[in-house]
């Protein structure tokens, strides 16, 4: 009788140990999974950076810093803690990106417009590589764009126009400043010459905002006094 009871206790003990072992294993697996999820969605871990997204948003000019003629919002000011969702023209510009932002403005009659984009890279070297991709795109796609002589800005800058008849009055300026690349698209239905004049004034202010961001200042440069 004693022997039977002892065997029963031993079997029960082993069974309980086995159950506990499985529970602990599952619990440990679940804990690891939860930890991974937090890391993947964190502000600085993984591919994005919330602090970089906040800097991107600060660089983009708000409505009250725009010229009086461009006080209609065409694209709401926003930023995201990730690379741009569309990585083309040029392809490869998203490599090393940790945040991006965009805003757009237009005139009341829609004849003029200005679109601002900014990409924040993990470091200045990544931004430099991305700018090289932009240069290659502009120089080697002559059927799409034409490199133009533009005002120098930042650590490096590039300006080009478009061959498409629907975009002949649009210019794009690309400005690299430390770990940032800002792009500015200016459109003026009056013609390419008017677009150049607008670009000169607006790009100067945008370049200042990029510089202020690299100096840990709150970007405050304004184009409110500019006539376009």
Regions found by a protein language model. Name each.
Residues 184-202:
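A short acidic/glycine-rich loop-to-helix N-cap element
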Residues 98-106, 169-177:
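Short, surface-exposed beta-strand/loop micro-motifs that present aromatic residues
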Residues 15-18:
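C-terminal motif of bacterial Sec signal peptides marking the signal peptidase cleavage site
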Residues 115-117, 179-188:
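Short, well-ordered beta-strand elements
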Residues 99-131:
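A short acidic-to-branched-hydrophobic micro-motif
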Residues 1-7:
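Bacterial N-terminal signal peptides that target proteins for export
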Residues 72-86, 125-172, 208, 213-227:
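Short Gly/Thr-rich strand-loop-strand
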Residues 20-104, 200-203, 207, 214-228:
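N-terminal "mature-domain start" segment
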């Amino acid at each position: 009788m004693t022997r039977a009871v002892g065997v029963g206790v031993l079997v029960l003990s082993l069974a309980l140990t086995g159950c506990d072992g499985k529970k602990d294993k599952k619990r440990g697996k679940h804990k690891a999974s939860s930890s991974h999820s937090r890391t993947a969605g964190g502000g600085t871990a993984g591919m994005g950076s919330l602090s970089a997204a906040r800097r991107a948003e600060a660089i983009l000019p708000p409505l009250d810093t725009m010229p009086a003629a461009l006080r209609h919002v065409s694209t709401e000011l926003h930023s995201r803690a990730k690379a741009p969702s569309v990585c083309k023209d040029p392809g490869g510009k998203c490599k090393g990106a940790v945040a991006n932002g965009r805003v757009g403005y237009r005139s009341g009659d829609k004849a003029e417009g200005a679109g601002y984009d900014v990409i924040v890279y993990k470091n200045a070297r990544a931004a430099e590589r991305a700018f090289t991709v932009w240069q290659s795109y502009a120089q080697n796609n002559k059927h799409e764009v034409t490199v133009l002589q533009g005002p120098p800005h930042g650590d490096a800058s590039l300006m080009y126009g478009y061959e498409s008849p629907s975009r002949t009055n649009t210019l794009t300026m690309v400005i690299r400043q430390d770990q940032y690349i800002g792009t500015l698209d200016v459109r003026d239905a009056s013609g390419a010459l008017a677009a150049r004049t607008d670009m000169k004034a607006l790009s100067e202010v945008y370049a200042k905002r990029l510089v202020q961001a690299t100096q840990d200042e709150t970007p405050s440069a304004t184009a409110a006094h500019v006539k376009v």
